[in-house]
A protein has these predicted regions:
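Hydrophobic alpha-helical segments within soluble ligand-binding/sensing domains
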Residues: 148-155, 160-184, 284-305
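An alpha-beta-alpha
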Residues: 56, 74, 164-210, 306, ...
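Beta-alpha junction/loop-to-helix N-cap segments that form part of ligand/metal-binding clefts
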Residues: 93-153, 245-260, 264-269
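Pocket-lining segment of extracytoplasmic ligand-binding domains
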Residues: 194-270
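Hinge/cleft segment of the Venus flytrap/periplasmic-binding protein
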Residues: 299-358
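Extracytoplasmic "Venus flytrap"
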Residues: 50-76, 81, 92-101, 192-196, ...
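Structural motif
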Residues: 88-112, 218-233
Length: 358
């Protein structure tokens, strides 16, 4: 599977007609923000009267490697489901640019255009789509919401999805395993990200229990994150934890070299952080999460299921991704590092720094 990483300045529109499991009219193509058209993913044969046709809005909160990976996995799995169940599906992709106003505009449009289902990717996108769809029966199947309860996405009749909830204690144990006797850990995150709230609380609780001091720094933009990273370096921390925080993920390529130069190990809540230079990423398999999200969509559209029949899913946390060149630049022995990590993970993979998965 190929994953693409890009910083979008406009909404992304793609229509992909896929053979697949009556019919609804195609939604209008208007939007309150600029959009561009991407090539179709695949060409579908002519629709017969018996073929059901569904129109799905995929609303990505912003562009970065993790969310791109999820979106592509969703589309690939829905392609397979379409072929297996005999329905036809068209997609329209929207990008909210991590902007609440843009996401609200998208929400108003997709609800007005009466899509058969909406797939928001990440917490803010999900919250905006749920608000926009309030009072309608439009199915909303979110992907990668770290804490659905905190985000206010539970107990809503037309809403379900997948969660990338993080096992924070496991990551903190990785830090301690690689740094026996460590007495201070940095926490780098965006205060406005719901996806970070519980994980940061868990990290603080872990540190308090184990007699470890914490140094917290925050940022809401890439520039602020760079300053926060510099402040952590100035504070003398040797290890930093970041959860599944979209703001920090977007800035990772801008800060990883500073951490390397200062001898700081960055431990993070997703493999895409590691791809972008952080020493360690830990968490769920985002391809698996995207596939599970697509499966929920096909069950809702084709199998007569309702969101109430499909409670939100969580996944095993256990995959460690090590950026080999970062670990080596920090003077760490890769074999020894893997041995130290083994008790706290189910799998260890390696990557080298890049903008996107390939």
């Amino acid at each position: 599977m190929k994953k693409f990483f890009a910083v979008a300045a406009s909404l992304i529109l793609s229509a992909a007609m896929l053979t697949a499991c009556g019919s609804s009219a195609a939604p209008a193509a208007t939007t309150g923000a600029p959009e561009t058209t991407a090539a179709a993913v695949t060409q579908a044969p002519e629709t017969t009267e018996e073929t059901k046709s569904f129109h799905i809005a995929i609303v990505q909160q912003l562009d970065h490697a993790s969310l791109d990976e999820i979106r592509l996995a969703v589309e690939d799995e829905l392609t397979k489901a379409a072929a297996d169940k005999g329905f036809q599906v068209s997609y329209k992709e929207f990008n909210g640019q991590n902007d609440n106003t843009v996401l609200n505009q998208i929400g108003a449009q997709v609800v007005s255009d009466k899509y058969d289902a909406i797939i928001p990717i990440a917490s803010l996108a999900a919250q905006c789509m749920v608000t926009a769809a309030d009072g309608t029966n439009t199915p909303i199947i979110y992907a990668a919401v770290s804490d659905p309860a905190t985000a206010g996405l539970t107990d809503i009749p037309n809403v379900t999805g997948t969660s990338d909830a993080l096992n924070t204690d496991a990551i903190m144990n990785l830090i301690v395993a690689a740094n026996p006797g460590i007495d201070t850990i940095g926490l780098l995150y965006d205060l406005s990200q719901d996806s970070s709230t519980q994980a940061i609380a868990d990290a603080k609780a872990f540190c308090e229990k184990n007699g470890i001091k914490v140094v917290e720094k925050n940022g809401t933009t890439t520039a602020e994150v760079q300053m926060a990273a510099e402040a952590l370096v100035a504070a003398g921390v040797k290890a930093v934890f970041t959860p599944t925080d979209n703001t920090i993920m977007t800035a990772e390529l801008s800060i990883y070299e500073s951490f390397i130069e200062a001898g700081v190990q960055h431990y993070t809540g997703a493999d895409s952080f590691a791809l972008n230079g952080a020493m360690v990423g830990y968490g769920v398999d985002y391809v698996q999460l995207g596939e599970a999200t697509a499966d929920m969509v096909s069950q809702l559209l084709c199998d007569g299921k309702t969101p109430a029949d499909l409670p939100y899913q969580t996944f095993d946390n256990g995959i460690v991704t090590i950026t080999t060149e970062t670990a080596e630049a920090l003077g760490l022995d890769l074999a020894a590092l893997k041995e130290a990590f083994k008790p706290y993970c189910t799998e260890i993979t390696e990557v080298t720094t890049a903008e996107n998965f390939s």
